[in-house]
Amino acid sequence: MKISGVDIRPGNIIEYEGGIWKVAKIQHTQPGKGGAYMQVEMKNLQDGRKTNVRFRSADTVEKVRLDTQDYQFLYEDGDQLVFMDQDTYEQINLDSDLLGDARPFLQDGMTVQLELWEEKPISVQLPQQVEADIVEADAVVKGQTASSSYKPAVLDNGVRIMVPPHIESGTRIVVDVYEQTYVGKAG
């Protein structure tokens, strides 16, 4: 399916210059002179190269259609992750790099979606939101309530995020995996 250059979104898988690329970041730019364009940072899923490309609204790219299949995360073996197909119980080993920044949020027994291109796994999608425990949270500074103040906190997986002042150590919260932001209290 062809899409316009300005319709590219993070997470899209596109075909570009003979390769399969995953869009990591986009930035819409409207210069004072000339036409608007989309600055796209993407990673080649076959060899791991990264590149930045400008797409104008007149440019079109082929959006790759992927098959998705549910797998369950079993365990980690070095830098390999072992998943099990929930239908056939077949196990598959994948490189932990496929998860990118979402890697710390992978939990034992978690159901994930493997994205397959020509029956080869190219991406692992975790649930959008997961629960995590706060193991360390800074104290609230009195008088900091004039603006919507957030404070730094550390999750049980080692990731640092900003949380509201009322969140303390030991609190279970919901976190957006891909934005790595606080969503709310769990439960």
From Swiss-Prot:
It is found in: Cytoplasm. One of its GO terms (molecular function) is translation elongation factor activity. The keyword Cytoplasm applies. Pfam families: EFP, EFP_N, Elong-fact-P_C. The keyword Transcription regulation does not apply. It comes from the Bacteria. Its main location: cytoplasm. PROSITE patterns: EFP. One of its GO terms (cellular component) is cytoplasm. One of its GO terms (biological process) is peptide biosynthetic process. Keywords: Cytoplasm, Elongation factor, Protein biosynthesis. Pathway: Protein biosynthesis; polypeptide chain elongation. Involved in peptide bond synthesis. Stimulates efficient translation and peptide-bond synthesis on native or reconstituted 70S ribosomes in vitro. Probably functions indirectly by altering the affinity of the ribosome for aminoacyl-tRNA, thus increasing their reactivity as acceptors for peptidyl transferase. Belongs to the elongation factor P family. PANTHER family: ELONGATION FACTOR P (PTHR30053), TRANSLATION ELONGATION FACTOR KOW-LIKE DOMAIN-CONTAINING PROTEIN (PTHR30053:SF14). This is Elongation factor P. It comes from Erythrobacter litoralis (strain HTCC2594).
